[in-house]
Amino acid sequence: MMLSPDQVSLIGLVFETYVMEHHKSDIQQILQENTEDLHYPVVVNAMTLFEDNMEVGECFNAFPSKVLPIFDNALQRAAQAISQSSSSSPQDTFRLKHNMHVRISGLPVCPELTRDHIPKARDVGHFLSVTGTVIRTSVTKVLEYERDYMCNKCRHVFSVQASFEQFYTFTPPTSCPSEEGCGSFKFTCLSGSDAPPAACKDYQEIKIQEQVQKLSVGSIPRSMLIILEDDLVDSCKSGDDITVYGVVCQRWKPMFQDCRCDVEIVLKANYIEVNNEQSTTALVLEDIQKEFEEFWDSHKHDPIAGRNEILMSLCPQVFGMYVVKLAVAMVLAGGVQRIDASGTKVRGESHLLLVGDPGTGKSQFLKYAAKITPRSVLTAGIGSTNAGLTVAAVKDSGEWHLEAGALVLSDGGLCCIDEFNSIKEHDRTSIHEAMEQQTISVAKAGMVCKLDTRTTILAATNPKGQYDPNVSVSVNVALASPLLSRFDLVLVLLDTKNPDWDKIISSFILQNKGAPSESLCLWSMEKMRAYFCLIKTLKPRITPEANTILSRYYQLQRQSDSRNAARTTIRMLESLSRLAEAHARLMFRETVTVEDAVVVVSVMECSMQGGALLGNVNALHTSFPDEPCEQYKTQCEIVLERLGLSDLLQRELQRLSGLQNGRPGSPKSPQSHSEHRNENTTSTNHSNQELGLNWFHSLSSSSNITSNNPPTPVITSTQNATTPPDMTSRNQQQQASVWAKSADVSVEEAVQETVSKKLRGKRLKEMKETLLLSKDDDLEDIFSHSTPMKNSKRKNMADTYQESGEDLHDKFTNFTFKPREKMSHANASTSTSAPEKQKRKIETDSHPPAEGGRANKTLRMETHSKNKTCIESEKDAIIPEAPKKQGVKKNNSSLRPPAEGSRAYKILRMETQNTNLTPIESVRDSMKPEAPKKQDVKKNESILCPPAEGSRADKTLRMEMYNTPKDVSSQLLNDDSSAQKQMFEDKEHPQQLLSRLNALSPGENDDGSNKKPLKTDHPKAKVASSTLAKLSRFSFTGSSEEQAGHKTVQTPPVAANGGVNVVATGSEKQENMTNMSMRREISDRQEDDGETAGRKRRCFELGSGGSAGLIKGFSLFSSSVLDDEDFDDVWNW
């Protein structure tokens, strides 16, 4: 069907009237242009045109190829009419243009006219709009679309149009078209090789591809050729998202004999609308700029809160992750590109690498950033090659063309690469030039050129296996140092399995079902896109103060011992400058201030993974602060004090004070997730709390947050844990735990501690006035891993530490305390006939006078260490058959009574007189050595070599020991067994003892070469016989570091006569306390003679449960004189 002449004239008249009414100003502007040979478009909205005249719309949809030339002719007549009728201005100002074209846009949104997919054969001849992405652009060509021919017979000249369907080839005429009808078929082409072409125009072909997000499931994107002519040439470039308005046509190459005709479908474009530039063009609107200016004017007293409001609108489906959102926003804002004095171009785009465990939201940030950026490409590293990332050479129609890759397609925009470490190594090195020099040099298929890649790269990758904080980031992600140094920021997101974080995230996802919450404070995606396009037009300048902070921080990073060589290069200083400019853009400022520099240093510290200021920060667990100004104040103090810029700190704090004084009220953070945080966040001040500096706010209970003390963030140190300066909460926890343990300890319980002789001696030396303390004393100043003790005792020990200025916490951090089971004491039932006076006497023995000498304190400690199973322990002692001479000498010397007039003799005599025991002379007479009889020798051998447990001899021995007079038998048994045991130990470990003796200091060496009697600091005091009796179970080596066995404290039942009742129960034998003073005399004798053996490690027990022990509740772990060298045993708690 063809249009009639009447329809053609009607369509032309209607369109001319429409143009004169709606586009008169556009035509006048075109007529004022000086150049007449250019092609000028007049964009006409199809919806408006069809509303004015429906018949024109119907004809246009039915015959678009016929109607469009009619529109162009009508436009020419309208322009001529406007030029002639204009009398307000001189005629010479309007120049008639012959190349004016009508461009149709704004088709009705319906499936018949608007397509998201590539048209098919049934769409041929229809005017459609197709949306896609430009993947290839060809070079611009000169197209000859018309030729002049002359008839050789009648000399008639006529024009021949090139056939679009046959790739603009010319078909020679078969007959003369003149009216005379000469019938000649011979013609001469006037546009020969010598003559210039009569009519030419620009021609270009581009290829578009369907957008992936608009495809159905499982579909592969298809592509289509678009024909551009005249003013449409070079209107778009590779990577642009465009909407093409045009006519779907078929074309084929000229047919030849025995050649198959290949028909292809192309779209002859009438108008191209670049979707990327829509947001940019909308920025010129004054109302949008005014809206953003009013927003920042409302936050002039707290600009950080306004910035956080923008960050909350960035990827709102991800909860928290404050540092990551801030870093992504600064990267999207970008810095200012500049050219230095030497002419070298310094890039302004920043690059960001997100390294994290699976499920930490890395891909969500990449997708959102690609959506709000006008020009972006999103790809994955697993399917990317060198040619796919840079450029590929493709041969099409006998010619080589360059197809742009992901980096070239994203020129001037954003390139998001997921799974960055999946790119092959030789392909990964190809993007080095694109990231730093922002160009790609190509030498392929005879084409040598350089393409621009002025793009921002936002990459995400998973660590290689489990992230190891002890190695560098390049090893964890398997990326080379040259590539890693090109990233301005590298944020590590570690999933530390924090229970509070898991609870918040699960509640946030389930309650909102993954959708962003409906909140008035969140910006829409269109508004975010418009804002980031607007701030990219700003060009902030760096102030000298900001330059000082950035340069000082760079120098500090270079001098850091734990610095990463791949990150701390000169590129780091350029990155700091770019990020500072980006933050100034984000704050809608034209100047880079101290605030921008401090924030950039804070984010860089999170990126360095072992920074010079605070170490490591897990960016995953950072959330938005309730008081942004207070958080910035804390950051400012930490950064500037560490950098030594106190003058800048004072000025900045004054500026912040002025802002706070000027604002009407305290700023409230419009955190969209605050409800979830307040409802679901519990206090994280428990034993497994992750500690860190007050750097970025994170999980914390709202009740524990004050304005003066910013909340401690829940961060995970990836290398070395950083101890926070404020340990108040931890001390409170320890105080509560210690008191809880103290409350659970009953009178029957005691705690077993294993210590060395040297440690025990030092402990006894310093315990003078630490017996009775109040229960309500504070434990905050004493950090102890020991057993619970009385509060009054802790108070005195705390005062001792305050006076000495020592930090016991530091002393105990290098030791490991191993828990052991506590041993319960049996309740010793007191005899009903025991008077109250005797009970008070035992308590008095438990607390001797504070002014007692060293010997008195030693006796108190040793008395406390009596074991109830002494008889069984004697059975295990192995007695050598032939003791050495030294051992025999020791045994003989240990049995000698003290000399008359000696110090030990006077003490022993006084004690025996006070207790009405056997006189000392009788004891000495009974202990004189004499030739033993055969029967006695046999008895001694049976004692020294105990029979097997449970045998008849064992039972007989027990009965004999029970019935033996309690004057000398138990003394002989203990003395002989202790001497033989000491002799065996000397024989069994000679090398070990010798090495330990040589390692001692001269003042501590008590071997045979230094046989000097030890002198105590204080004179020995009087000791009760009951105390001496309990020492009979221990062997003393003559050293100041007394030996003690691994015993369990038991309080013997008190009898009416002042003695001790004997309980004959299998393993429990308690001896009579009479005639036991000889043991102390023998011990003193050994000290005077100076005959000692090597150091041996023994254990003793301290009771903390009540009155069961003689020394109540002392703990060696709280000693104020403990040094690292004192801990020569394995500590057990």
UniProtKB/Swiss-Prot annotation:
Keywords recorded for this protein, A-Z: ATP-binding, DNA damage, DNA repair, DNA-binding, Helicase, Hydrolase, Nucleotide-binding, Nucleus
GO cellular component, one term: MCM8-MCM9 complex
Summary of subunit composition and partner proteins: Component of the MCM8-MCM9 complex, which forms a hexamer composed of mcm8 and mcm9.
Polar residues: bias regions: 719-737, 826-835, 1024-1042
Enzyme class: hydrolase
Protein name: DNA helicase MCM9
Molecular function GO labels: ATP binding; ATP hydrolysis activity; DNA binding; helicase activity
Lineage: Eukaryota, Metazoa, Chordata, Craniata, Vertebrata
Major subcellular location class: nucleus
Secretion signal span: none
Positions with a binding annotation for ATP: G356, D357, P358, G359, T360, G361, K362, S363
EC number: 3.6.4.12
Ranges where the MCM domain occurs: 304-509
Organism: Danio rerio (Zebrafish)
